[in-house]
Swiss-Prot record:
This is ATP phosphoribosyltransferase regulatory subunit. It holds the Pfam family tRNA-synt_His. It comes from Streptococcus gordonii (strain Challis / ATCC 35105 / BCRC 15272 / CH1 / DL1 / V288). GO terms for biological process: histidyl-tRNA aminoacylation; L-histidine biosynthetic process. GO terms for molecular function: catalytic activity, acting on a protein; histidine-tRNA ligase activity; transferase activity. Keywords: Amino-acid biosynthesis, Cytoplasm, Histidine biosynthesis. Pathway: Amino-acid biosynthesis; L-histidine biosynthesis; L-histidine from 5-phospho-alpha-D-ribose 1-diphosphate: step 1/9. Required for the first step of histidine biosynthesis. May allow the feedback regulation of ATP phosphoribosyltransferase activity by histidine.
């Protein structure tokens, strides 16, 4: 049977799905290059240390013939950090990319383990200018892909980082708390604060409710937290939102937004739509990533778009075509 079945999380694309996802990738890539982004292609296989200091259970690992531990890339941003640190690429610079990334999903939820992405990285430019360009190009890319209804949701990585650094948790405790926050598990968070009391107890217990219209979330958060670093992060998000008022009609915030990648250090954002349960675009600031590769800190922001999720968001609006195999939709 292994000759005709696929590994868990792998899927064939046929007919309309194959054609439209190709067109989305092509059109967004062409648009970004026309906007001055330099195309970059990075290898599918990398040394595992590019992405983590230890073996991650959700990465695909393999040994080459010399016994070196390699990984199928789980994201492209870390690879671009390696490129900046190891070559003579001059900054500031802007990159665009598209290609496959791989994540091993332990849970059998029908999730894809091979993902098609397109994205950008803006490196070395003034922070405010870079943030605005990143969000503008994200919106333009979604519009180009004909996504009709979507919402930008903002947060700031320093909020949870400040709390975690103060609590000094071991890796298991930190993972458990982040899981409670991600799932908005009020009981779990409450029990955690009872066992590990801190100055952030009230804020943590309120986190499952700190999402919705941006100004309401900001106002409520400022009522229950007095930590200077968190307040500065809230101010940073508010300033960005003011700058985006002409571009985005409505914005939301979720202060319990757990960053998709560990390297985010500042503003983070995700984009959600009505027809897709998870975010189909995510991004943020990651100024300190380059230190991982022995380079100096650089202002940096980027985003990645899940092409297959964008297809799910628009495919009901597309005309049918020949071919009836289920995975071809």
């Amino acid at each position: 049977m292994n000759k005709i079945t696929l590994p868990i999380g792998m899927h064939d694309k046929l007919f309309k799905r194959a054609r439209v996802t190709y067109e989305i990738e092509r059109d967004i890539s062409d648009f970004l290059m026309a906007q001055g982004f330099n195309r970059i292609d990075t290898p599918t296989l990398e040394h595992f240390e590019v992405f983590s200091d230890h073996v991650e259970p959700h990465h695909y690992h393999l040994f080459d013939k010399k016994g070196e531990l390699l990984v199928l890339r789980p994201d492209v941003t870390s690879q671009i950090g390696r490129v900046i640190a190891s070559t003579r690429v001059h900054t500031p610079t802007k990159f665009s990319y598209s290609g496959k990334v791989f994540h091993y999903q332990e849970e059998l939820r029908g999730l894809a383990n091979e993902l098609s992405q397109a994205g950008i990285e803006i490196i070395g430019y003034p922070a405010r200018e870079a943030v605005l360009e990143a969000i503008k190009t994200a919106k333009q890319s979604l519009d180009l892909a004909q996504v009709k209804s979507y919402q930008f949701e903002f947060s700031h990585a320093a909020i949870l980082q400040t709390i975690l650094e103060s609590l000094v948790l071991d890796s298991q405790e930190e993972a458990q708390l982040l899981d409670y926050i991600r799932k908005k598990n009020r009981t779990g968070i409450f029990e955690f604060t009872q066992s590990r009391p801190s100055e952030f107890d009230d804020f943590l217990q309120e986190l499952p409710y700190l999402f919705g219209p941006s100004q309401q979330v900001l106002a409520r958060a400022r009522e229950i937290v007095d930590n200077e670093r968190i307040l500065t992060a809230l101010d940073d998000v508010e300033q960005v939102l003011r700058s985006l008022s002409d571009l985005l009609d409505q914005t939301t915030m979720d202060l319990g937004q757990v960053a998709t990648m560990p390297y985010y250090t500042g503003l983070t954002f995700k984009v959600f739509g009505d027809r897709v349960p998870d975010a189909f675009l995510s991004g943020g600031r990651y100024d300190q990533l380059f230190k991982r590769f022995g380079a100096t800190e650089l202002t940096a922001i980027g985003w990645s778009l899940d092409i297959d999720s964008v297809y799910q968001a628009i495919h009901d609006d597309l005309p049918d075509e020949g071919g009836k195999e289920g995975d071809g939709r």
